Amino acid sequence: MATPSNKNSKSHKRNRRGHIGLNVPNIVLDQTTGEYRVSHRVSPSGVYNGKQVIDKK
C-alpha cells in the first residue's frame, strides 16, 4: 500500500479536501400550494411545472 514519504500538513490536507462539503438544497416557494419544496422536483401534491403529473390518491 502506498504511504506518503513526508508528512502532509493540515493546510495541504484541507486544500485537497476543499471541494468536499455539504450542498445547500435549492428550496423554492411552490406557486400552486404555497409550500416550500426542492426545485426541479415534483411537489407533494403531484404538480410539476404547473402541470398535474402524478394523481394524488
Curated annotation (Swiss-Prot):
InterPro entries named in the record: Ribosomal_bL32 (IPR002677), Ribosomal_bL32_bact (IPR044957), Ribosomal_zn-bd (IPR011332)
Gene Ontology process terms (BP): translation
Region (Disordered): 1-25
Disulfide bonds: none
Any GO CC annotation of this UniProt entry: large ribosomal subunit
Molecular functions (GO terms): structural constituent of ribosome
Keyword Cell division attributed: no
Keywords: Ribonucleoprotein, Ribosomal protein
Ranges annotated as biased composition (Basic residues): 9-19
Family: Belongs to the bacterial ribosomal protein bL32 family.
Protein name per Swiss-Prot or TrEMBL: Large ribosomal subunit protein bL32
Organism: Leuconostoc mesenteroides subsp. mesenteroides (strain ATCC 8293 / DSM 20343 / BCRC 11652 / CCM 1803 / JCM 6124 / NCDO 523 / NBRC 100496 / NCIMB 8023 / NCTC 12954 / NRRL B-1118 / 37Y)
Origin organism lineage: Bacteria, Bacillati, Bacillota, Bacilli, Lactobacillales
Gene that encodes the chain: rpmF
